[in-house]
Amino acid sequence: MWGRFLAPEAGGRDSPSGARSFPAGSDYSSAWLPGNESLWQATAVPSNHRNNHLRRHSITSDSGDTGIGTSCSDSVEDHSTSSGTLSFKPSRSLVTLPTAHVMPSNSSASVSKHRESLTPDGSKWSTSLMQTLGDHSRGERDSSLDMKDFRPLRKWSSLSKLTAPDTRNHSGIAYPQELRNSLEMTGKGKPFMSHLRTFGPSCLHDSMELLKLEDKEINKKRSSTLDCKYKFESCNKEDVRVSSSALRRQTLDMTYSALPESKPIVTGSETFESPKYLMLGQQAVGGVPIQPSVRTQMWLTEQLRTNPLEGRTTDDSYSLAPWQQPQTEEFQQGSETPMQVLTGSSRQSYSPPGFQDFSKWESVLKIKEGLLRQKEIVIDRQKQQINHLHERIRDNELRAQHAMLGHYVNCEDSYVSNLQPQYESSSGQSLFTEQPLSHPHQEELEQKLASTEKEVLQLNEFLKQRISQFSEEKKKLEEKLKTRDRYISSLKKKCQKESEQNKEKQRRIETLEKYLADLPTLDDVQSQSLQLQVLEEKNKNLQETLIDTEKQLEEIKKQCQDKEVQLLCQKKKEKELVTSVQSLQQKVEKCLEDGIRLPMLDAKQLQSENDNLREQNATASKIIESQQDEINRMILEIQSMQGKLCEEKLTARSTVEELGRKEGSLQRLTEALLENQRQMGETYSLLDQGHEAEQSRPQTIHSKWPLFDLTVIDQLFKEMSYCLFDLKALCSILNQRAQGKEPNLSLLLGIRSMNCSAEETENDHSPETLTKKLSDVCQLRRDIDELRTTISDRYAQDMGDNCVTQ
């Protein structure tokens, strides 16, 4: 970066030579300080003196997480290389004015320095300046070793150390020690800076033309690369040991080394140096404190260095290198699917019916990582916009410097050749002469500087606001991530419960299927029912046979008992016979003993007795045989009687049923008889009344009654005679049925004889006929009473039989 001309107060009396000096701070290179007596040239540094120190210690976690909550070791990349030989031959001229030439560097390296300086209030400033020094002619590019591929978010920490100023600048140019001593001597007062500000404006015209051409070429060759990786740099307590307790606080410095603005393009026309920082307020030129305006400007430059965007345009800041485009496309393709899953289709992927393997939860976590990376890319782009604004500020500063340097024209090499030996001889004195610059031009530059400072302050405030917004968004995203993790864990639990429930349901289904498989079908049920009917019929048949066999067994038992009785009787007879035979044998023995004494008559008697006994025995055997035959005959008779008994039982059952029907008919008949009795009572009362009337007035009836009344009486008697005949027939039928006889069919069917019809045709109303009919009616009442008594007796007998059977 171009060194900024500082404008202290005019009046450089402390410097004897009257020349202005540049403080060897963060924005100034020693190339601006030419010698007084001889031409200074950039000496080439040998290849063995190149500082190419790479100190890289990174332990990245390959667990697949987003890097949040993990920390990696320090990653300090120090690339300080120099290559090629610098040849600078200043043009000679008669004008003896010092010139400030900007020498292009041929080195191509990516310089990343992390330095830390303490502010006066004790806070730590951790800044990261990534600069690129490249060959302008070749346009070589050297990228960091960490930018080879896309990786998830990592935490990087680098220790910024308080280091002393190095004796070698980052472009690899070594300057004489005398020049540095002269710088220290010339920086002891303010007039040196004012002399340099009012230095002749015509000396640097040629060099500024070269710078403009080189800037155009630089703007053509700008490109950017994209690497989605953060480096979280923090301070380590072991490396930074400060005596004061206030200096022990550590701050987290996030340097986005993976973003495009943190990887500047290597060009040979610009020399961006990363000087060593000192504490603001303690920087001095030769031990003298810097003015507040200078301190403000230096502080602004330090703020610009925290997140620099070096050598970028708006279009180039979002462009990708050719080798990174396919990786970016793959990353976008890989992150589109997670976005769809988590936004729209993630609710469908949680449907419980399938209940897939739990390995898919890992894919969901990877999807979340992809979302976080996309969020980080958006944040990076917003930070790129902020850095683009910083770039515009730097461009404005460059324009201001170019305008200031444009006034230094007609600067010849002869003056420089005359100045260099004078500068080398006068080591303790400053040999610059200050020429007065036009006051209005100086005021205009100061106004521009103030406006740029104001813009820088505004941009810094805006940057702080955006950083705070980004931090809040990051916290929100972390909270959302935690809630999503909790939600995922709850979903896992739910899935486990549902899987267990499904297993239980599956077990139940299997048991039900087994049960249904064991159940018989309709054909089986029908066949079993048929078998059951067949078995029932067989069972009935077997029961009947069993009953028959039991009956036969009882009969056989009875026969056996009878036979046993007979056998006992026969045994008794046999015993009697045996006793008689024994007695006879004894008698025979006695007879044999006394045979001499027995006469012949006794022998004949014994012979006859034996014959009788034999006859008796034969008759007894015949009797026994006859008795056995009788027993057999009786057994047959008993069997026949048993069959008859069964038949009689069946007939008895049928008769009982018939009797039940007859009882029902008898009940109906009794009801009819009661009704007839009531009617007969009424007729009797009417007949009694008529008989009394006839007896009282037997003669005057025919004379007094009119013809109409006689016909009515005839009709009444006719109907009464019909009722009397029917009642007689009914009483006779009931009596016959009660006695168990067959009823008279003519009476039952109501067939009347001719005599009855002849009697009915008679219209004799004589007292004899009336008395006869009255006697018939009385007889009918008696018959009805008898019938009632028989029916009641029969009913009482039936009730008694029913009670006995029950």
Curated annotation (Swiss-Prot):
Specify the domain of life of the species encoding this protein: Eukaryota
Q: List where in the cell it is found.
A: Cytoplasm, Cytoskeleton, Microtubule organizing center, Centrosome
Q: Name one GO cellular component term.
A: pericentriolar material
> Might you name a Gene Ontology BP term for this protein?
neuron migration
**Which residues are recorded with the post-translational modification Phosphoserine?**
S15, S207
Name the UniProt key words of this record, in alphabetical order: Coiled coil, Cytoplasm, Cytoskeleton, Phosphoprotein
Q: Where is the composition biased (Basic and acidic residues)?
A: 135-146
Member of which family? Belongs to the CEP85 family.
Q: What does this protein do?
A: Plays an essential role in neuronal cell migration.
Spell out the protein name for this chain: Centrosomal protein of 85 kDa-like
